[in-house]
Amino acid sequence: MSAKPFSHPITVHPEDIDFMGHVNNARYLGWVQDTVLAHWQKLAPAEEVASKAWVALKHEITYRRPAFLHDAVIAETVLEKIAGARSFYNTVIRRGEEVLAEVQSMWCCLDSETHRPARISKAVAETFFGLPAKAKTTGA
């Protein structure tokens, strides 16, 4: 069982557009980062948000369709699993019902002072999964 999906609206700006007239592929990864961080900031306790930072470890992206200037785009992300300091997300970027990109990503939680990996506590995991954390976290 995954966490509840989280939707994040995206506005396509002129600086997102490349020489081909559509959103540059690299911008999609920025949108994923914006979405994952917004998810964390919305659901995590304030003290966790203040004391933790996130870095991307891995992205696997499949591009389906281009996005264009002024498109109304939504990124929907699902936290699939927490393993120690790592979190695994699946994100789908859409324009209406049309899938523009699908992204699987792995993130590492860091202590914002030491910049060392910081395990996600079971209590914090429960705020995302809404069930006993042991059901969706591992010690890895």
Question: What is each residue range found by the language model?
Answer:
Residues 1-74, 80-140:
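Terminal targeting signals and extreme-terminal segments of soluble enzymes
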